């Protein structure tokens, strides 16, 4: 389905929303102070706000110490961006990278939105490539955008979460969590970003720490975070994550697509201006896999609301992506780290909301071929 069709339906739903008279679910009111006090101390082991410099630095230092203790002298970071169906390109790049025999074993892998769905496979390595290819090029993603019909005016989203959650549950299994927990014990980290819509903060989740807790609650939270990170607001419903109690109130948080606040996360926002102290540090490389196109493209925009809305959204996302690329590149240069990006080629036909199986297979094959040929990665201009 084309982006303009989705946005046209979303615009119709927005116009009709005041007529609905009720929402799809209600929540109890609470204050920012209650939300803060409800978070249990143990939550610091599995999540932090990306803008919280102290929390981000504490997490970074713990990870560096454990990696150094395990003999790692270089830290390779892979950040996988959002991009919807264009994630097929990124999935293809990962598989092609394996075939080229140049794919690193990443110490840190992060994901946002569709990148959150790719990240666990990228983290676990080449023996999961076949499953990753099946997820993005096997046709299962084509049912993700399943409409609600007229019920959308009474709902929190345009599309049902049923197929998105089903996709996550199909591939995110206890076996996957067990392997992630094993790698976490070695000091490697798998991080997924969501947006806490109540606090307007990017929340970074340590998925290896969640997996290491074990049990059904761990599996549920792991899946909830993945679904939340991919839940484009208005397109898919938000994910409600219970947190704790404060003043006798049950406190929960509303989480949506991590791309609302960050198109990708290689360096948490709170560390953008941080510089490593003098002395021996671990060398590092940052790879940003962009499931989309960075460069502006010219088009005569027609005077229809969905077209204008779609073009504006696309422009905003590209501008935000380029700003984040610049900030992360500057961080890498200050801290003596290599920095490379991969993106969907300008000439490729792609659409982040086109989950047509043939289109996704073509995009996957393009990413795979480019990686095999050594043409996928480059230093930013």
Model-derived regions: residue spans:
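C-terminal motif of bacterial Sec signal peptides marking the signal peptidase cleavage site
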Residues: 18-21
């Amino acid at each position: 389905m084309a982006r303009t069709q989705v946005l046209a339906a979303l615009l119709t739903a927005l116009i009709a929303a005041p007529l609905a008279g009720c929402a799809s679910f209600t929540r109890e009111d609470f204050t920012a102070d209650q939300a803060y006090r409800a978070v249990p101390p143990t939550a610091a082991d599995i999540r932090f706000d990306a803008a919280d410099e102290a929390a981000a630095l504490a997490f970074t230092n713990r990870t560096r110490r454990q990696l150094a203790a395990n003999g790692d002298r270089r830290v390779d970071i892979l950040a996988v961006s959002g991009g919807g169906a264009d994630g097929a390109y990124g999935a293809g790049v990962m598989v092609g990278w394996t075939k080229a025999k140049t794919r690193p074993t990443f110490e840190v892998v992060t994901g946002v939105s569709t990148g959150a769905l790719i990240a666990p496979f990228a983290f676990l390595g080449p023996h999961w490539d076949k499953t990753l290819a099946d997820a993005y090029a096997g046709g299962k993603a084509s049912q993700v955008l399943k409409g609600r019909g007229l019920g959308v005016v009474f709902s929190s989203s345009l599309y049902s979460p049923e197929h998105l959650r089903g996709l996550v549950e199909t591939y995110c299994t206890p076996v996957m969590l067990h392997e992630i927990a094993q790698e976490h014990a070695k000091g490697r980290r798998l991080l997924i970003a969501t947006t806490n819509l109540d606090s307007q903060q990017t929340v970074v989740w340590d998925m290896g720490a969640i997996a290491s807790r074990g049990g059904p609650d761990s599996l549920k939270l792991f899946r909830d975070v993945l679904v939340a990170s991919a839940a484009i607001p208005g397109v898919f419903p938000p994910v409600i994550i219970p947190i704790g109690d404060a003043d006798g109130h049950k406190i929960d948080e509303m989480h949506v697509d991590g791309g609302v606040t960050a198109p990708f996360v290689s360096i948490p926002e709170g560390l953008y201006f941080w510089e490593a102290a003098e002395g021996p540090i671990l060398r590092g490389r940052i790879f940003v896999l962009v499931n989309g196109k960075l460069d502006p493209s010219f088009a005569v925009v027609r005077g229809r609301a969905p077209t204008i809305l779609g073009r504006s959204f696309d422009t905003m996302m590209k501008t935000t992506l380029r700003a984040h690329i610049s900030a992360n590149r500057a961080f890498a240069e200050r801290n003596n780290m290599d920095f490379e990006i991969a993106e969907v080629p300008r000439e490729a036909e792609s659409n982040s909301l086109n989950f047509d199986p043939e289109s996704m297979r073509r995009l996957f094959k393009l990413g795979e071929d480019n990686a095999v040929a050594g043409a996928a990665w480059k230093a930013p201009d």
